[in-house]
Regions:
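Glycine-rich loops and low-complexity Gly/Arg-rich segments
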Residues: 116, 126-127, 161-163, 171-172
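Short helix-coil boundary/hinge micro-motifs
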Residues: 1-148
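Short, non-ligating residues that shape and space the ligands of small metal-coordination modules
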Residues: 148, 164, 168
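Short, glycine/charged-enriched secondary-structure capping and boundary segments
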Residues: 152-153, 173
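Cysteine-rich micro-motifs
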Residues: 153-163
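Contiguous alpha-helical segments
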Residues: 172-179
């Protein structure tokens, strides 16, 4: 494991959230936000309304900027995010995780918790200087983000669909050149 479990989950959640904005947008309803929330084991306050959905959707470009920034820019963004949220890191334990960090109260708005948890995860990325683990999908027609947690740093595509599309295109190109 490259990072602690909570860091990896926070990064995976942030990448999934950012990628939900790629066409077709997959975060257009409160039900879809509920699915995202459950998929990444978020806990705490949920308003479950359109205002919460709109706030989370508006966060996507902010997180994209953070996750695609260089090291020095990331530090500035992380510090601003944590200061704006009044973050105070504390160790907590709740199901399904053992001891891990939360930096805002569980009753903070979901958008604040997402922002702060992503910023806290990026602290580990900055400290380990592992920015090569974050990138943009190698598919020319896709702008999705890639989080590469593989041991050999081999992940190039944001999804299986993008990887398969490129494998098929490469196969067809090879077959076409044989004729």
């Amino acid at each position: 494991m490259l990072f602690t479990h909570d860091t990896e989950v926070s990064l995976q959640a942030a990448v999934a959230l950012v990628n939900s904005a790629e066409p077709p947008d997959t975060l257009t309803s409160v039900d879809e936000l509920d699915e995202w929330y459950a998929a990444f084991s978020y806990t705490g306050r949920r308003d479950g309304d359109r205002a919460e959905l709109d706030a989370v959707r508006a966060l996507r470009p902010v997180l994209r900027e953070l996750l695609t920034s260089d090291r020095d820019s990331a530090v500035e963004l992380v510090n601003a995010m944590l200061a704006d949220a009044g973050a105070l890191p504390q160790l907590v334990r709740h199901e399904p995780f053992d001891w891990h960090l939360h930096a805002v109260p569980v009753d903070a708005p979901l958008v604040t918790r997402i922002t702060v948890e992503t910023a806290m995860a990026m602290i580990d990325v900055v400290r380990a200087d592992e920015f090569s683990r974050l990138g943009v999908c190698a598919d020319d027609g896709c702008g999705g983000l890639v989080l590469d947690l593989s041991r050999n740093r081999s992940r190039r595509y944001c999804s299986v669909a993008c990887g398969n599309r490129n494998a098929v295109a490469a196969y067809r190109a090879r077959q076409g050149s044989k004729r």
